[in-house]
Amino acid sequence: MNMKTIFESKNIRFVEVTEFLLEEYLTMVNDIENVAWWIGKRTEAIPEEKEIKWVRRKLEEKAPIFSMVEKKSGEFIGNVEFMDMDESAAELGIAITAKKQNMGYGKEAVSAIVKYGMNELGLKRIFLKVYPDNMRAIHVYEQCGFQEYDRTDEDIFMEII
């Protein structure tokens, strides 16, 4: 399958979101246990039609969202995106499939997307929110240079400048 590569890191190709990966997207977002770490708790599956609309909307908007594909195998790793972006700041979001976790892809992806955001998109500030009990993600974000700047019972807010 032909996917347009936007940028790369050592082990990851960052490609445009595409309907070719729809099955992988659905598997990832409907893994209720895994998705609880980055979207929150829910019990219903996301239907295929809704996910197709999401992909098409992101493509039409030319949104800065990328699917991550393993260079060596071509397997889907997850998605990473900038949300609520203005000319100098954006919120970072990342989702990695359960089977590709604990393999170093999170740190590599966060480092690469931060570099892309600052160098290619001209961002001066990148921020994110993470659940306080998601210690693996917090550790990765800290390793990539993010620092906590606020906290509530539900979220920790981190940024890199």
Which residues does each predicted region cover?
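Conserved acetyl-CoA-binding loop-helix of GNAT-fold acetyltransferases
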Residues: I96, N102-G117, I138-Q143
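Conserved G/P- and acidic residue-centered "switch" motifs that form tight phosphate/ATP-binding loops
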Residues: G74, G104, N134
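Conserved functional loop/turn residues at catalytic and ligand-binding sites
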Residues: L21, E33, K100, G104, ...
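A short, well-structured alpha-helix characteristic of acyl/acetyltransferase catalytic modules
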Residues: M1-I52
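Amphipathic alpha-helical recognition patches that constitute DNA-binding helices
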Residues: E24, E91, A95, R136
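Short alpha-helical
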Residues: F20, E87, M135-R136
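Acetyl-CoA-dependent GNAT
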Residues: K41-G93, T97-K99, T152
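C-terminal "cap" of GNAT-fold acetyltransferases
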Residues: K124-I138, Q143-I161
